[in-house]
Amino acid sequence: MKKFIFTITFFFIPLAYLLAEVDILAQPADERATCNTFSIVAFDPETNEWGIAVASKYLAVGSAVSWAKAGVGAVATQASVNVLLGNAALELMGKGKNAKETLDELIKADAGREIRQIGVVDKNGMTANYTGAKCNPWAGAKAGKNYTCQGNLLTGPEVLDSMAKGFEETKGSLGFRLLFSLAEGEKAGGDKRGKQSAALLVVKPNGGPNSLGDRWLDFRVDDHPNPIDELIRVANLTSRFKAVLKVK
């Protein structure tokens, strides 16, 4: 009975209070989950799909960074990652806030904002991104129509430039374009520490198995010497990928 009461009480804690209490700056540096990474979040208005592709020298990066819900939007939360921001962003967008309004509210409420990095795309393809002043350099973001790329601890801005160009100039399914963008980012330098994991998540209405749920593509490579190549190989095993991207 006590457990039930606690659960209900916790559910109604205001978002601002909950996020403000998570002050990661007060934690020792070696206890922080730090997803130094590069990612792209995007929307395809023709297929009504939202997706994220991410890679990092971090174990199982997809488990922390990637968040999406069909008809709502997609979110990448990274750097000194606060996983609460993923669901919180989807909840705010589900209530009608656009990408910028959502991001502004989250950042205002988060005590660890200086070491966060977030990319958001909403149900209409509007994007917003934020890079905290204390994210590990090189850190920044680059946005275009229906997408935003962001990264930290990168070899330089050319990583995001290559990702953006790859996404804009490539035709095919959203999953294909996301992975192509990710591969171009790695080719340009990627995470300056190296590589370990990568993930691809694409959602669409009734996109899950037997038209249940929204997970159209959901692939992760959690620990591999060439995670993007392996992610491409796995994605090509399904007909849902719709376009073959060759492992380089």
Task: For the regions a language model picked out, list residue spans one by one.
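Bacterial N-terminal signal peptides
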Residues: 7-20
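Positively charged n-region of N-terminal signal peptides that target proteins for export
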Residues: 1-4
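N-terminal nucleophile
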Residues: 22-248
